[in-house]
């Protein structure tokens, strides 16, 4: 039997556990569109308007608010109620002056962390990989599915797992944060999700085993997590506010 295309429906009981939604109130949930984030690390914009912030009581009201262009994601108006909003994205409401950054909490749920207006123009982007393209240029691919092109002379300034502080919506690089000992990181997944601290040691393993980092939190406690889960957010101290 031939494939019928991608799934378009999602039951609430099967929705990602990172969503703050009532699972037994209704049968169906909004399935996010394919976009910058995967379904597990993002949440549809409709739930932010209705369930998280309470600006609407029904999905119809939430869609109407979005169609009026009252919500910005990373400085751009988003009207698609299925648009996936993920980790480190900035949600802004110009009419009320509210700004939030999407981050996980200690139980792995995605939350809206209030931030200042000045910080709303800064978005940390983790470099997943980079590749050469035509014209002797290098394309940096980030964790949110976006990319940025730099000259080949600058390629040695950017490496995998480094974080780029990007000015949004202009997409201008403000600063590069290297992934190294002493860097301040925020854990985005795993059993230590939402913990933060400085890198003490980077353990590299052969035969394709994932690298592990040892982190010292603000209380002086040491813990390990996968390198992939550690998101650099500063050098001596974080460049953004954290929960």
Curated annotation (Swiss-Prot):
Part of the 30S ribosomal subunit. Belongs to the eukaryotic ribosomal protein eS4 family. Gene3D superfamilies: 2.30.30.30, 2.40.50.740, RNA-binding S4 domain (3.10.290.10). GO terms for cellular component: cytosolic small ribosomal subunit. GO terms for molecular function: rRNA binding; structural constituent of ribosome. It comes from the Archaea. InterPro entries: KOW (IPR005824), Rib_uL2_dom2 (IPR014722), Ribosomal_eS4 (IPR000876), Ribosomal_eS4_central_region (IPR013845), Ribosomal_eS4_central_sf (IPR038237), Ribosomal_eS4_KOW (IPR041982), Ribosomal_eS4_N (IPR013843), Ribosomal_eS4_N_CS (IPR018199). SMART domains: KOW (SM00739), S4 (SM00363). Keywords: Ribonucleoprotein, Ribosomal protein, RNA-binding, rRNA-binding. This is Small ribosomal subunit protein eS4. The keyword Ribonucleoprotein applies. PANTHER family: 30S/40S RIBOSOMAL PROTEIN S4, SMALL RIBOSOMAL SUBUNIT PROTEIN ES4. It holds the Pfam family RS4NT. GO terms for biological process: translation. Residues 43-105 form the S4 RNA-binding domain.
């Amino acid at each position: 039997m031939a494939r019928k295309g991608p799934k378009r429906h999602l039951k609430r009981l099967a929705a990602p556990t990172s969503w703050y939604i009532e699972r037994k109130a209704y049968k169906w949930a909004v399935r996010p569109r394919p976009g910058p984030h995967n379904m597990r690390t993002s949440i549809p914009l409709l739930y932010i308007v209705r369930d998280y912030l309470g600006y609407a009581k029904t999905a119809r009201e939430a869609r109407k608010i979005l169609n009026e262009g009252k919500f910005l994601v990373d400085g751009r108006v988003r009207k698609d109620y299925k648009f996936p909003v993920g980790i480190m994205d900035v949600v802004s409401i110009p009419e009320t002056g509210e700004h939030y950054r999407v981050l996980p909490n200690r139980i792995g749920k995605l939350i809206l962390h209030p931030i200042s207006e000045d910080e709303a123009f800064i978005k940390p982007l983790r470099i997943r990989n980079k590749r050469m393209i035509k014209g002797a240029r290098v394309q940096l691919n980030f964790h949110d599915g976006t990319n940025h092109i730099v000259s080949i002379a600058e390629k040695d300034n950017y490496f995998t797992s480094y974080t780029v502080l990007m000015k949004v919506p202009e997409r201008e690089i403000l600063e590069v944060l290297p992934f190294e000992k002493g860097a301040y990181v925020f854990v985005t997944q795993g059993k230590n999700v939402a913990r933060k601290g400085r890198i003490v040691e980077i353990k590299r393993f052969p035969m394709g085993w994932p690298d592990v980092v040892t982190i010292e939190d603000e209380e002086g406690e040491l813990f390990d997590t996968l390198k992939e889960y550690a998101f650099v957010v500063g050098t001596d101290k974080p460049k953004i506010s954290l929960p």
